[in-house]
């Protein structure tokens, strides 16, 4: 059985969030939370919140044992981009893309054996 949590339209670029989610893929949930607590990246608290939500979903909705949970899948998709403009020389303007992310965490019970 799998439990999932999704955070949509998080105002951090997907490229930066992927650096953090790569650290926890395949780990036990306790170890993953410890890694996120000690990772000095802006995306770490957001990913930790989504992971804790997935754990709570597993415990409440599917009655899984929290001690046996592992991070089965974790991935980041690109959300909608906010387009802004920055004034430049000689009356021109440059486009600034403020990127957003959709973060998905899937946890499941560790297989015996």
Curated annotation (Swiss-Prot):
The record, for Gene3D superfamilies, names:
Ribosomal protein L22/L17
| Keywords linked to the UniProt accession | Ribonucleoprotein, Ribosomal protein, RNA-binding, rRNA-binding
**Pfam families this protein is in?**
Ribosomal_L22
Q: How does it assemble?
A: Part of the 50S ribosomal subunit.
> HAMAP family from the entry?
Ribosomal_uL22_B (MF_01331_B)
Task: Write out the function statement from the record.
Answer: This protein binds specifically to 23S rRNA; its binding is stimulated by other ribosomal proteins, e.g. L4, L17, and L20. It is important during the early stages of 50S assembly. It makes multiple contacts with different domains of the 23S rRNA in the assembled 50S subunit and ribosome. The globular domain of the protein is located near the polypeptide exit tunnel on the outside of the subunit, while an extended beta-hairpin is found that lines the wall of the exit tunnel in the center of the 70S ribosome.
Per the similarity annotation, which family is this? Belongs to the universal ribosomal protein uL22 family.
- Protein name as annotated: Large ribosomal subunit protein uL22
Gene encoding this polypeptide?
rplV
């Amino acid at each position: 059985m799998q439990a999932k949590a999704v955070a949509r339209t998080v105002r951090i670029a997907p490229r930066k969030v992927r650096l953090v989610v790569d650290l926890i893929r395949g780990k036990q949930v306790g170890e993953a939370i410890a890694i996120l607590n000690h990772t000095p990246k802006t995306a770490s608290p957001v990913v930790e919140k989504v992971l804790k939500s997935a754990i709570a979903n597993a415990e409440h909705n599917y009655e899984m044992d929290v001690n046996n949970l592992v991070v089965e899948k974790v991935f980041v998709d690109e959300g909608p981009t906010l387009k802004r403009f920055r004034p430049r020389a000689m009356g021109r303007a440059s486009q600034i893309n403020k990127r957003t992310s959709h973060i998905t965490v899937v946890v499941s019970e560790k297989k015996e054996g």
